[in-house]
C-alpha cells in the first residue's frame, strides 16, 4: 500500500485499525521505509485509527467523519450504550473497520458521537434507525464538544502480587481468582502489548 501510494503519488487510507493492527502496520511501514504515513482517528485520544499514507506533493483529505447519534428515548427509558450502537451499525452490513471510536456525551447520555469512515456517513445516517430498544437519529457533526473529547477516566491501581505472571497481575486488578483471570487470558479477552 505504501509503495503504491508513493509510485502513483496518490493518498491511500486503510479502515479503522485496532491497537494491535496499528502496531503491525507501523512495523510494516518501518520495514518498507515508508516515511509519509500517520494514524488519525478523528480526535487526539482515539484508540481506533486510520492509517493515512499521503506521499509528498499529493492532495490530503480527512478520511474520518463524525456522526451525532441521538437516542429518542422516553423519560425513564434506558438509552443505548456502546454495545447497542456498535451492534446496530454492524447489523447494517458494515465491517468493523468502517467504525472508529464511539464516545458518549457525559453531559447528555442520549447523545453519542461516532467516528466513521467518510464514505460511510451517508449510508449510516440514512439507515441507522434504532439501537437497543430506542429509535435513533444520526446526523452529521462538524465539532465534538470538549467535554466528550476528554475521553474516559483511567485509574491507576497498585497491587502486591506473588509473581509477575499475567494471570496473577490480572487477578489482582480484577479482584478475582487466578483461575478466572487465566480463563480470560485463554479466551483471548486480554492482551498484553497487543499480543
Q: Locations of the language-model features?
A:
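Ferredoxin-like alpha/beta domains used as RNA- or RNAP-binding modules
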Residues: 1-168, 172-173
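A basic, amphipathic helix-loop patch mediating RNA/tRNA/ribosome contacts
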Residues: 157-195
